Design a protein with these regions (language model features):
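Bacterial N-terminal signal peptides that target proteins for export
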Residues: 18-32
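Bacterial N-terminal signal peptides
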Residues: 32-43
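Short, low-complexity N-terminal intrinsically disordered segments enriched in polar/charged residues
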Residues: 42-80, 84, 101, 165, ...
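A solvent-exposed, acidic/Ser-Thr-rich amphipathic alpha-helical stretch
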Residues: 55, 74-129, 141, 147-148
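A short, structured loop/turn motif at beta-sheet edges
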Residues: 126-132, 158-163
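Short beta-strand edge/turn micro-motifs at domain boundaries
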Residues: 150-177
Length: 178
């Protein structure tokens, strides 16, 4: 701890003196060491399984979005997004905020099945940032009668009570091929 000494200089003050620390018996020290190792081993073995489960759950959300899109179900597609005013969607040099705003944009831009085409996600990479947040990136492509728009996306997902949901979507389209 730092405090001013009698001369007004900043000085380090010891919080504990050696007399304040009580000795630990060898048996208790072994028990503490063994228990600590067991807890770390349990945590280490659970982490890969939790990571795999989270990645599988996120892949399922994106697959459900793709399936809903390919049925012409924009509302079903939107189930992958957090129903929140803070949900963000960035594309076409525009930032849209709020679940309803994002849904309305999809409904306007893809007002019929021919405009929707068939959606395919590929090159999916998912990285957990914590136990309740992840980033996913990949490619998207729409197969339509007259064109095949495609591009890249980066998503930030959060684990909410209803499951993993997209809270931030940055999608870009490649220039059309001549």
């Amino acid at each position: 701890m730092l405090e001013l000494d009698a001369a007004g200089h900043l000085a380090y003050k010891r919080l504990l003196s050696p007399q304040m620390i009580s000795p630990v018996s060898p048996a208790r020290a072994r028990w503490i060491a063994i228990t600590s190792c067991m807890l770390m081993a349990i945590r280490a073995s659970a982490a890969p399984e939790q990571t795999a489960n989270a990645i599988t759950e996120i892949r399922s959300v994106l697959q459900a979005q793709q399936d809903a899109w390919n049925r012409g179900d924009i509302d079903g597609f939107m189930n992958g997004y957090a129903r929140s005013a803070s949900t963000v969607f960035i594309s076409e040099d525009t930032v849209r905020r709020g679940w309803e705003t994002v849904r309305d944009r999809y409904r306007e831009k893809y007002s019929n099945r021919s405009k929707m085409g068939t959606l395919a996600f590929s090159d999916l990479e998912i990285t957990l940032l914590s136990s309740d947040s992840a980033v996913a990136s990949g490619s998207w492509k729409l197969n339509r009668a007259n064109d095949q728009p495609h591009g890249q996306f980066t998503l930030i997902l959060k684990r909410l009570p209803e499951g993993w949901r997209i809270v931030h979507d940055h999608t870009s389209a490649a220039p059309p091929t001549p």
